[in-house]
């Protein structure tokens, strides 16, 4: 394979990857109208969201999971505006004015997408997991197994993460932010 052919193959891969990634992000946002006009508007919405999430240090898993409830609220209550309502999703942001501006753009996108609100929430909850394995969760399970020969935490995590999209009301604590001490956990490729 020549260098030009390799560059061409890499370019094709990048275009395919970007297309699928963008499609997945639209689904995570509950936007299923894939017309070219909607896709272009959704691209602007997604890019501004990614910047907003990064600037505000928002936990992506928590954001995307809570977004389905926010979308339902935006679609079912015409009087609702994020600026007037303290919502759990809004509370994730330090810059609430920026979130409010994004939320207004998001509502416009939802209004152009014909999917019924409750069905949208169900579809979003099936693509946005509530639970992911976080370093601190693995650390607790490892420490219990090593120091106490107690494998119950591993079993519990295995069961929980086997169905990460389900609510698991008795396991809500695993869906929250990591504890402060977890910032000190260091993971390497040889761990």
Region locations from a protein language model:
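Regulatory N- and C-terminal appendages and interdomain linkers associated
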Residues: 1-191
């Amino acid at each position: 394979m020549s260098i030009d052919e390799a560059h061409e193959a890499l370019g094709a891969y990048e275009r395919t990857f970007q297309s699928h990634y963008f499609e997945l992000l639209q689904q995570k946002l509950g936007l299923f109208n894939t017309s070219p006009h909607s896709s272009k508007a959704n691209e602007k919405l997604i890019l501004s969201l990614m910047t907003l999430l990064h600037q505000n240090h928002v936990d992506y898993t928590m954001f995307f999971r809570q977004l389905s409830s926010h979308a339902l609220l935006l679609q079912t209550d015409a009087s609702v505006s994020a600026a007037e309502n303290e919502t759990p999703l809004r509370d994730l942001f330090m810059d609430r004015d920026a979130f409010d501006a994004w939320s207004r753009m998001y509502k416009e996108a939802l209004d152009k997408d014909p999917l019924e609100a409750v069905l949208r929430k169900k579809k979003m909850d099936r693509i946005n997991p509530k639970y992911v394995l976080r370093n601190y969760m693995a650390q607790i399970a490892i420490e219990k197994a090593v120091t106490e020969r107690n494998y119950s935490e591993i079993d519990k995590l295995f069961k929980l993460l086997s169905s990460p999209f389900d609510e698991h009301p008795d396991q809500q604590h695993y869906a929250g932010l990591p504890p402060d001490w977890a910032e000190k956990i260091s993971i390497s490729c040889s761990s």
